[in-house]
Amino acid sequence: MRSLKLILASASVVSATCPYMSGEMPNSQNGPLDRRHDTLSDPTDQFLSKFYIDDEQSVLTTDVGGPIEDQHSLKAGNRGPTLLEDFIFRQKIQHFDHERVPERAVHARGAGAHGVFTSYNNWSNITAASFLNAAGKQTPVFVRFSTVAGSRGSVDSARDIHGFATRLYTDEGNFDIVGNNVPVFFIQDAIQFPDLIHAVKPQPDSEIPQAATAHDTAWDFFSQQPSSLHALFWAMSGHGIPRSMRHVDGWGVHTFRLVTDEGNSTLVKFRWKTLQGRAGLVWEEAQALGGKNPDFHRQDLWDAIESGRYPEWELGFQLVNEADQSKFDFDLLDPTKIIPEELVPFTPIGKMVLNRNPKNYFAETEQIMFQPGHVVRGIDFTDDPLLQGRLYSYLDTQLNRHGGPNFEQLPINRPRIPFHNNNRDGAGQMFIPLNTAAYTPNSMSNGFPQQANRTHNRGFFTAPGRMVNGPLVRELSPSFNDVWSQPRLFYNSLTVFEKQFLVNAMRFENSHVRSETVRKNVIIQLNRVDNDLARRVALAIGVEPPSPDPTFYHNKTTVPIGTFGTNLLRLDGLKIALLTRDDGSFTIAEQLRAAFNSANNKVDIVLVGSSLDPQRGVNMTYSGADGSIFDAVIVVGGLLTSASTQYPRGRPLRIITDAYAYGKPVGAVGDGSNEALRDVLMAAGGDASNGLDQPGVYISNDVSEAYVRSVLDGLTAYRFLNRFPLDR
């Protein structure tokens, strides 16, 4: 018998004053480029490293530790049948057959990251939540961004509401803010959630379309359930197709309660405000990205964190006294309504920085389970009927995904503090409880684990002032009835170009609706929001334009609410393409790269050429480049126009032409610049009759600091909307 030297592989263990009081914003302190050694990540690494398996210098083994000496199955002779006794084969194949777990019913497509939340101040005057009880106090977090309707394999750039779920691993337990990138939802009562999802998911007969609402059942539901209009307007705007997950806000959607140690309660809405600035894609660009890079959003987030350009968000609270909740012309318990910011400004509470990518997608991003019922002392619920249903649904669905009740024991789901209770057994139990008296009250274990209360061991408590009374009814409050005024508020608050984008989105979606009845019903609902909007959509989808239905018309606006028309706050991780020729243009390109890096080293400079050439710095080929994946495009030394087998015909011109058509900054440096950009304008349908001096177009004969600064200013402006036509 051959002997093996047995090596057992074991798991390695790796081991302030509120700035607003002085009128200063906190500075962003980016750590070193290697995020794995960032000190802010230490609490996360220290906890999760207990579960790491390091295969370095190890021997391949079975799941039970037996060394494996060969990768062939056991056979009776070298051409004979495989034997059933081959336990190595059986174990490997069986594990593979069961690797996949059911995907989330919604929010299946997602990406996540670890980080840290820092409180700006001691907020114990408004909440007993311990993670907010000291200025500078830090709490580990994990955030998962997602789309809603698509399956796990769908594209990132699909038009959709986007999930923004945050877990804070506080020193008194886990607190989840399970929100979206828009502040409202489609329905007011959780009992309709299955109806909504059945309607927006692919048609049940054909399983078409994937990750899209451009079909009959979705718009049938929207037109029959007008509470969906407000969220629908947000989804049809730039919020439905964001530039990246770094450029979205996160909203808690519901009204919650904050409760102090003394029992005083305040109503609150949560918002994570992006400190990168909000930014959206345009629809043709989003469609192109779906084919060119289906992982565009998750790659953007991953790359930003890997390069040390940590995205940041500021947590804000809208605070309303309990006694004032009836002073608004809408109900604070209605999840289809916002509190306009001019009525209740946000109080800045703290800052979140995402600074560490997952080490294993499945173990962390896929297995994390968020639950609105994960609250801590100082946070309480309201009677929002959608929230009350989510408290059940988000917990129940985990039984299907994880096959038992012990999903909270998974490393990514565990609190960072000890936990003790009488829950026992179940599939996948990971602990060995020592207490034989698994019940309360008991004397056999001296009453342990003992109950906490409001004054002893800081037990969770409900706001003392909460009371419930009234007859049992199946109805919504009449204060929920007006579902048209706030969609109009949203529409009124968009810029003229953003309104055009929304109109175009509704035209596109409804052009795919086959039922004339559904299309007519859609126009009826849109007309209750805005007659001009309804007429513009109707004319494009074969429906007679309606007369005004002014019951809910008004001229109110709120703060800038869209994703275009405001400057970006940071340029971190944006990409500028330098289109090179196979000649002396590389010298100019390298000068440009150096100048951009000197002016702002947070922007990525990508040299595009016919073939990869590390010595010249060419890190992308024309065959792999596209105008959708860059934020600005500059031609260096004239356009490459010759035919080549290395890229599709006309690709260099197409890259910059598409970038121009998407409203992005474009430019040219060196010989042939004017000719190149004139070709671009002609190909894109632009107007070059008045010269090339127009917003977002940058021309120079040589590299200069002024030229580089002008392009960076164009990136800050983000998109040049004058290139997009408006309805006359």
Swiss-Prot record:
<dbReference type="GO" id="GO:0046872">
    <property type="term" value="F:metal ion binding"/>
</dbReference>
<dbReference type="GO" id="GO:0006979">
    <property type="term" value="P:response to oxidative stress"/>
</dbReference>
<feature type="active site">
    <location>
        <position position="180"/>
    </location>
</feature>
<dbReference type="GO" id="GO:0042744">
    <property type="term" value="P:hydrogen peroxide catabolic process"/>
</dbReference>
<keyword id="KW-0376">Hydrogen peroxide</keyword>
<dbReference type="InterPro" id="IPR041399">
    <property type="entry name" value="Catalase_large_C"/>
</dbReference>
<protein>
    <recommendedName>
        <fullName>Catalase B</fullName>
        <ecNumber>1.11.1.6</ecNumber>
    </recommendedName>
</protein>
<dbReference type="InterPro" id="IPR029062">
    <property type="entry name" value="Class_I_gatase-like"/>
</dbReference>
<dbReference type="GO" id="GO:0020037">
    <property type="term" value="F:heme binding"/>
</dbReference>
<comment type="similarity">
    <text>Belongs to the catalase family.</text>
</comment>
<dbReference type="InterPro" id="IPR010582">
    <property type="entry name" value="Catalase_immune_responsive"/>
</dbReference>
<comment type="function">
    <text>Occurs in almost all aerobically respiring organisms and serves to protect cells from the toxic effects of hydrogen peroxide.</text>
</comment>
<dbReference type="Pfam" id="PF00199">
    <property type="entry name" value="Catalase"/>
</dbReference>
<dbReference type="InterPro" id="IPR024708">
    <property type="entry name" value="Catalase_AS"/>
</dbReference>
<dbReference type="Pfam" id="PF06628">
    <property type="entry name" value="Catalase-rel"/>
</dbReference>
<keyword id="KW-0408">Iron</keyword>
<dbReference type="InterPro" id="IPR011614">
    <property type="entry name" value="Catalase_core"/>
</dbReference>
<dbReference type="GO" id="GO:0005576">
    <property type="term" value="C:extracellular region"/>
</dbReference>
<keyword id="KW-0560">Oxidoreductase</keyword>
<dbReference type="InterPro" id="IPR024712">
    <property type="entry name" value="Catalase_clade2"/>
</dbReference>
<feature type="active site">
    <location>
        <position position="107"/>
    </location>
</feature>
<keyword id="KW-0575">Peroxidase</keyword>
<feature type="binding site" description="axial binding residue">
    <location>
        <position position="394"/>
    </location>
    <ligand>
        <name>heme</name>
    </ligand>
</feature>
<dbReference type="InterPro" id="IPR043156">
    <property type="entry name" value="Catalase_clade2_helical"/>
</dbReference>
<dbReference type="InterPro" id="IPR020835">
    <property type="entry name" value="Catalase_sf"/>
</dbReference>
<keyword id="KW-0479">Metal-binding</keyword>
<keyword id="KW-0349">Heme</keyword>
<dbReference type="GO" id="GO:0005829">
    <property type="term" value="C:cytosol"/>
</dbReference>
<keyword id="KW-0964">Secreted</keyword>
<dbReference type="InterPro" id="IPR018028">
    <property type="entry name" value="Catalase"/>
</dbReference>
<dbReference type="Pfam" id="PF18011">
    <property type="entry name" value="Catalase_C"/>
</dbReference>
<dbReference type="GO" id="GO:0004096">
    <property type="term" value="F:catalase activity"/>
</dbReference>
